[in-house]
Structure formats: structure tokens, C-alpha cells
């Protein structure tokens, strides 16, 4: 996978690509949807947007497809409120995205009314239960296309976007050390299963976890021998009171870690 350097987790991206990703991440933060979500925060959104870009590049998406994928990634968890179920939040997110773009026809994401239904389908589908391991539920996608009145002549494009967002979201399961940890068998695209991509997902999550732990403990360095993802997960599960907003990474810190 040429886009990822051998000395990962840094990615070999051109400046214009970095700017495109950074713009989406900043705009997602500015919506305010993720300000109070501790477990699906901007750290998660930023990584899913980045994974989406890497997958989309390797899959040779068109410029229009890439835009729709990145915006879907930016909004995919906007429906989470901390008390939702896995299925409800995706439908709620599709609804919130619809409300956002309807109220903001001129928006920083450059999404128009014709593109919105496609984004809603992709957001809604990202937590859809699939019957076969690692395979899209095409009947489910067809149902959502009808539900949101998305263009039926673009069903192949929509299926591809659904596949890539699901895989991008799944790759960030490397932020979990035990329950919910990534199982590559659930990935759908060959690109997501590439050793370079799996290694990148694992290492970038270690980098993020180390940075957050440094804030929590007020130290300059975390030992390389420590599994930072596992330690941070234990703190989240057992000592949530330690993890206020002051220990979250700000947007510039997030972008610096990514690039």
C-alpha cells in the first residue's frame, strides 16, 4: 500500500491531501455534535476520516465519491448521546445529518440537497447487522436507498461507500484492548485487510493513547513497553472520573499526531 510509509504510523500524503482531511476534521468539530461524547470523541472521528481517506485512495474513488465518504465519516457517530443502542445511533445520526444540511444549504462540507440522501444511507448503514461475515447486506442497503429516496441508479457507488465506511470505523476498533477489539475477519474490503493498513490502525491508536495518558498523568513520556491502549481502556472503564474534557486532545494535537 504505497500511501503508507514503512516507518508508519506517519502517512505519506501530499499537502493537499492533508489539508483536505484536516478541513473535514475541523468542520466536524465545529458542528458541536462530538463535544460531550467521551467514548466516540473527535479522536475517533478524526481517525475514521483518515482511515476512510486511505481506503478511498487505494480503492481509486472519484473526487465526488471521496467527498461523500469523508463527510459520511465525519457525521457517522453524530447520533450518539451516550445512552443509545448500537442500531439506534446510526439512524439518529442520519436524521441529524439531514437536519444539519437542510438548515445549512450553504455549508463548509459543500454538500447539496441531491447528495444528502446518499450520505444518510451510508451513515445509517454503518451499524447495520450483516448476515454473512465480512459481506455487505445489499438488501439492507436497497431498503435504506428507498427510505432516504437516494438515487437508485447509484446503488453500486452507495454500496462501495457503505463498505468503506464500515471498514474505516472497524479499523478504529484497535483503540480497544479487549471487548470490541478489531477482528479482521469482519472487514469487507481487501484494502482494509492489507497488513500495512492493519498495522497503521494498531500503531496510530497506540500513539493517540500514549498522548492522552501523558495528559492524565502529567508526564512527558510513556514507556514503550506499556500497552497504552490497554491502560487507557482500563482507566475509562474503572476511573471515568479521571477522564474529563481536560484530558481530551484538541484538534491541533489530533492533526499533529495524524500527520
Regions found by a protein language model. Give the residues of each.
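A generic structural signal for nonpolar/aromatic side chains embedded in well-ordered alpha-helices
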Residues: 25-28, 122-123, 165
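Short alpha-helical hairpin
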Residues: 2-31
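Membrane-interface starts of transmembrane alpha-helices
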Residues: 62, 112-117
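Amphipathic alpha-helical segments within well-ordered protein domains
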Residues: 53, 94, 98-102, 106
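Divalent metal-dependent phosphate-bond-processing catalytic cores, especially two-metal-ion Mg2+/Mn2+ enzymes
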Residues: 2-8, 33-62, 75, 107, ...
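Active-site-adjacent bridging/hinge elements
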Residues: 22-25, 72, 135
Amino acid at each position: 500500500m504505497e500511501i503508507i510509509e514503512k516507518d508508519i504510523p506517519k502517512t505519506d500524503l501530499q499537502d493537499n491531501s492533508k489539508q483536505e482531511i484536516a478541513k473535514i476534521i475541523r468542520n466536524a468539530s465545529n458542528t458541536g455534535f462530538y463535544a460531550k461524547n467521551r467514548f466516540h470523541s473527535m479522536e475517533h472521528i478524526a481517525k475514521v476520516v483518515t482511515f476512510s481517506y486511505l481506503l478511498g485512495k487505494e480503492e481509486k474513488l472519484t473526487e465526488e465519491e471521496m467527498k461523500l465518504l469523508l463527510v459520511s465519516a465525519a457525521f457517522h457517530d453524530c447520533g450518539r448521546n451516550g445512552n443509545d443502542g448500537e442500531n439506534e445511533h446510526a439512524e439518529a445520526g442520519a436524521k441529524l445529518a439531514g437536519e444539519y444540511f437542510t438548515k445549512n444549504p450553504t455549508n463548509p462540507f459543500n454538500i447539496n440537497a441531491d447528495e444528502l440522501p446518499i450520505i444518510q444511507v451510508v451513515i445509517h448503514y454503518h451499524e447495520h447487522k450483516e448476515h454473512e461475515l465480512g459481506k455487505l447486506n445489499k438488501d439492507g442497503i436497497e431498503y435504506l436507498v428507498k427510505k432516504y429516496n437516494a438515487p437508485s441508479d447509484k446503488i453500486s457507488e452507495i454500496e462501495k461507500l457503505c463498505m468503506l465506511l464500515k471498514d474505516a470505523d472497524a479499523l478504529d476498533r484497535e483503540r480497544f484492548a479487549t471487548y470490541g477489539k478489531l477482528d479482521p475477519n469482519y472487514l469487507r474490503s481487501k484494502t482494509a485487510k492489507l497488513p500495512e493498513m492493519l498495522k497503521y490502525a494498531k500503531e496510530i491508536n497506540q500513539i493517540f493513547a500514549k498522548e492522552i495518558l501523558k495528559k492524565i498523568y502529567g508526564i512527558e513520556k510513556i514507556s514503550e513497553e506499556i500497552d497504552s491502549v490497554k491502560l487507557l481502556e482500563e482507566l475509562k472503564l474503572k476511573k471515568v472520573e479521571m477522564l474529563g474534557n481536560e484530558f481530551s486532545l484538541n484538534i491541533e494535537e489530533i492533526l499533529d499526531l495524524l500527520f
